[in-house]
């Protein structure tokens, strides 16, 4: 029976259908210009770019020139690449231009679609960023699509790992820049650690089109980009605590797989306290005393490492290092590390070398990075299931773009078995059957462990004609994917999200030519062999089509419907036939976590025998409900985390904007003077209470404050003892003395050096305090949840206390800058041997090295006389030579102590 809503949709079409139909008028207008564009010479077509820019300068908007601009790009794509965007691709381009997400199925040409809005928006001259998930795709797409932009007189840049700042600056200066989300985010963070505007590489955030937008803005949303520097070595502590966990019994802890949490029971806590006490690590009586906060953190990490993290599923051990596996894509993520000591706990568990923990120097989430853009859009094959999240968090509407040809793929109902063993036996039989009939097959698994288990089982059954595609062998993945459509091919793959390479029936001729003819010089022989390869691939395609097209067989459901849909979407590209099917068991993770007990009892009552499966649409619906629950929970987590992160983000924006203002200003003398005057106001107000008699004034305290902040020995007690002296008189005398001392120092330095000194001190002090502030907010965030037990809203408490911490940061900044500038002196230092900078690490990428901000040998350096340095306050140290003893009194050289934090 058709519901009333279903009947209305049939009659009028869905809201999505109506929106898509609304683009038809402009599509017709673009098509009407096709003959006119074809008649233009290459030079005349390229000259359209300058013409459009003149029109924009004369007051037209991008919307006004959309139709002719799209027509120009379509013709250029045909001439340069031999590809003519279909009408549905024009619609996709318009959706992207209008700040929305275009959901386009696999094989529908998203890469080509992006060229339409990219060209249009690049005409504004502010730069357009096209965001991909890895360096390979960024280079591939920039190389291919850059030919279109180049033909039309535009420049194309690409940002990949390993480029110098100068190369990055040049790439960002181009009309169009292709880059990964990681590189963009880290360049932004690094830019806001620079000390001169000219050193920055990015030029703003105008328009970004994010490819695989669901992967970047949903799956990666919870992971912050972090640039960090090393802390002291604590490997002994990690190893000691790691030895305790295997000594515990199952009743000593509680594991919640749904929430990914692990906690000690009362019995476990008692055992742990005894072990810690024997090891001399426990302070006081209880593990949960305030002085044991750090130890609690370490033991919790060790428990999670042993009970929540699984080798070959969550991470692998390669070359003596723990390498994280992306749960959504199955890719290795070298260089990326779990934060807050969790990675070190895993290293202790696996008995590999423990790398030092890091202090966060700068961080931002993808959510907040991409929300900085004036205009944001995205493309993916699967976004509809996350439409609410895109709307709520990013203000992005999701529109499904119709396929150019109808989808012929058949999505079959799931087969559910009672045990994993029965399921895999059925899968092996199905793989052999598909191979015998010549049907190419993609077998999807949820982890490396599962893919290798299946591979071993296939070998034991006597079948070895398969390829394995997972994070262990990602170097070969492009070639394996390219040939996965050959008749009879069997490809076992971890989650295929973000692979970026289509599976073409018959194989990919271009990839084969690249591989097989790499050493063949251009000429008649190469042309003949290329032709032969293309003809062979065409015959293989016809054979694969006759066998039913690509067969996607999934061995398990993922907790996200979107990942399942991505796997299904590998089959049936561009109107090809295909089929997809999920083989499940009640022992699968999703089934086990979300109530398979009732289903198991029901299947037993139905008399299901060993090796038999149940196939029913009801099973699919029940699983979909379970997946929706997980998705809703994950969305709530991300939404809640964003509320907390927004607090830090608002403060980050203030600090970063302030840094840029300081770098852009001709002089920061007025800012420094204001800071100095505010410090005077603060110390006078603190030591001379309002309306208090002179006898109540704290003359000694005020004298000490003046000495601490202004490096002056003033006769405060004598002033206070004067007859009829007022608070304003004291303030004015201090101000006059301080201004005089500051003016004398400025005269000694000269205006040019003084401006450099002031700017350097303000920026370096701001950075130092900001890093400390980030750590303080992290600590606050880790404990704020307990306020809920006192019937207080943790988020409101966090906002309130974070604001107080920020106010304290600004107060500390005024005091530290003032104290340092009143002590700084010019000295000459002997030339020093070049020293390598300490490593900083950026999660997601390999360790980076910052630019050398130290002065070159023989230049004038700024230093504070040792007698004027406060060991407890780094802001009073000024410039410290790297081989000098650290002013903190540790006895170490500065470069091995506090100097390691200098970026």
From Swiss-Prot:
EC number(s) given by UniProt: 7.4.2.8
Q: Name one Pfam family in it.
A: SecA_PP_bind
User: Any idea where this protein resides?
Assistant: Cell inner membrane; Cytoplasm
DNA-binding keyword on record: no
Instruction: Note the topology in the membrane.
Output: Peripheral membrane protein
* Location (main, coarse): membrane
Note describing how the cofactor binds = May bind 1 zinc ion per subunit.
Q: Which GO terms describe its molecular function?
A: ATP binding; metal ion binding; protein-exporting ATPase activity
Similarity-based family: Belongs to the SecA family.
UniProt protein name: Protein translocase subunit SecA
Q: Which organism is it from?
A: Rhizobium meliloti (strain 1021)
What is the primary gene name for this protein?
secA
């Amino acid at each position: 029976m058709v519901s009333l809503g279903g009947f209305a949709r049939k009659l009028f079409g869905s809201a999505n259908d109506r929106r898509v139909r609304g683009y038809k008028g402009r599509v017709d207008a673009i098509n009407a210009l096709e003959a006119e564009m074809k008649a233009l010479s290459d030079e005349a077509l390229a000259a359209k770019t300058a013409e459009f820019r003149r029109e924009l300068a004369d007051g037209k908007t991008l919307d006004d020139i959309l139709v002719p601009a799209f027509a120009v790009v379509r013709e250029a794509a045909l001439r340069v690449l031999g590809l003519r965007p279909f009408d549905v691709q024009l619609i996709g381009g318009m959706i992207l231009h209008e700040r929305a997400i275009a959901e386009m199925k696999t094989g529908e040409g998203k890469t080509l679609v992006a060229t339409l809005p990219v060209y249009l928006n690049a005409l504004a001259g502010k730069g357009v960023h096209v965001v991909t998930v890895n360096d390979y795709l960024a280079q591939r797409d920039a190389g291919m699509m850059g030919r279109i932009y180049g033909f039309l007189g535009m420049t194309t840049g690409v940002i990949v790992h390993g480029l110098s700042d100068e190369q990055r600056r040049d790439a960002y200066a181009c009309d169009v820049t292709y880059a990964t989300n990681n590189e963009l985010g880290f360049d932004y963070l690094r830019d806001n650690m620079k000390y001169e505007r000219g050193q920055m590489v990015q030029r703003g955030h105008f328009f970004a089109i994010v490819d695989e937008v669901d992967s970047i803005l949903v799956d990666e949303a919870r992971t912050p980009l972090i640039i960090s520097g090393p802390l002291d070595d604590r490997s002994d502590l990690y190893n000691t605590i790691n030895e305790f966990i295997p000594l515990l019994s199952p009743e000593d802890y509680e594991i919640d797989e749904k929430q990914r949490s692990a906690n000690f029971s009362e019995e476990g806590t008692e055992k742990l306290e005894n072990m810690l006490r024997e090891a001399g690590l426990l302070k006081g009586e209880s593990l949960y005393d305030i002085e044991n906060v750090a130890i609690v953190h370490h033991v919790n990490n060790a428990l999670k490492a042993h009970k929540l993290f699984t080798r070959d599923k969550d991470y692998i051990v390669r070359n003596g290092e723990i390498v994280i596996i992306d749960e959504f894509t199955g890719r290795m993520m070298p260089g990326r590390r779990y934060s807050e000591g969790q990675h070190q706990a895993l290293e202790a568990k696996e008995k590999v070398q423990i790398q030092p923990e890091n202090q966060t120097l700068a961080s931002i989430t993808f959510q907040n990075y991409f929300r900085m853009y004036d205009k944001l859009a995205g493309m993916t094959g699967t976004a509809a299931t996350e439409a609410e999240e895109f709307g709520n968090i990013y203000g992005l509407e999701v529109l499904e773009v119709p396929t150019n040809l109808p989808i012929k793929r058949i999505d079959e109902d799931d087969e559910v078995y009672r045990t994993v063993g029965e399921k895999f036996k059925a899968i092996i039989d199905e793989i052999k059957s598909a191979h015998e009939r010549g049907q190419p097959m993609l077998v999807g698994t949820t982890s490396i462990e599962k893919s290798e288990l299946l591979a071993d089982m296939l070998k034991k059954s006597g079948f070895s004609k398969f390829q394995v595609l997972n994070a262990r062998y990602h170097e070969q993945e492009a070639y394996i994917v390219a040939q996965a459509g050959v008749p009879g091919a069997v490809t076992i793959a971890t989650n295929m999200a973000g692979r970026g390479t289509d599976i073409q029936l018959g194989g990919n001729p271009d990839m084969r030519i690249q591989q097989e003819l790499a050493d063949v010089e251009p000429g008649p022989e190469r042309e003949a062999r290329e032709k032969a390869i293309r003809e062979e691939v065409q015959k293989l395609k016809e054979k694969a089509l006759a066998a039913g097209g690509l067969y996607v067989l999934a061995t398990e459901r993922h907790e996200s419907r979107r990942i399942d849909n991505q796997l299904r979407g590998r089959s049936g590209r561009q109107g090809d036939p295909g089929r997809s099917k999920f083989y499940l068991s009640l022992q699968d993770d999703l089934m086990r976590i979300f109530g398979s007990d009732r289903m198991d009892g029901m299947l037993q009552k139905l008399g299901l025998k060993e090796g038999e499966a149940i196939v029913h649409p009801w099973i699919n619906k029940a699983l979909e409900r379970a997946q929706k629950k997980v998705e809703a929970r994950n969305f709530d987590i991300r939404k809640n985390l964003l509320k907390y992160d927004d607090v830090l983000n608002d403060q980050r924006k203030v600090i970063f904007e302030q840094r840029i203002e300081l770098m852009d200003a001709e002089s920061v003398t007025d800012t420094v003077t204001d800071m100095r005057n505010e410090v005077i106001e603060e110390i006078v107000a603190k030591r001379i209470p309002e309306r208090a008699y002179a006898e109540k004034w704290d003359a000694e305290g005020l004298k000490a404050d003046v000495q601490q902040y202004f490096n002056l020995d003033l006769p405060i007690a004598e002033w206070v003892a004067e007859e009829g002296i007022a608070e304003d008189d004291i303030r004015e005398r201090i101000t006059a003395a301080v201004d005089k001392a500051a003016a004398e120092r400025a005269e000694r330095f000269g205006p040019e050096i003084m401006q450099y000194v002031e700017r350097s001190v303000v920026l370096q002090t701001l950075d130092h305090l900001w890093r400390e502030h980030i750590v303080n907010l992290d600590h606050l965030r880790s404990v704020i949840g307990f306020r809920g037990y006192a019937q207080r809203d943790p988020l409101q408490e966090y906002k309130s206390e974070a604001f107080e911490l920020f106010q304290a940061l600004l107060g500390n900044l005024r005091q530290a800058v003032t104290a340092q500038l009143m002590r700084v002196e010019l000295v000459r230092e002997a030339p020093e041997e070049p020293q390598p900078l300490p490593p900083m690490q950026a999660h997601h990428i390999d360790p980076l090295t910052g630019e050398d901000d130290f002065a070159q040998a023989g230049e004038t350096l700024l230093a504070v006389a040792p007698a004027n340095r406060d060991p407890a306050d780094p802001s009073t140290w000024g410039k410290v030579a790297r081989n000098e003893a650290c002013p903190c009194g540790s006895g170490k050289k500065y470069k091995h102590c506090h100097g390691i934090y200098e970026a």
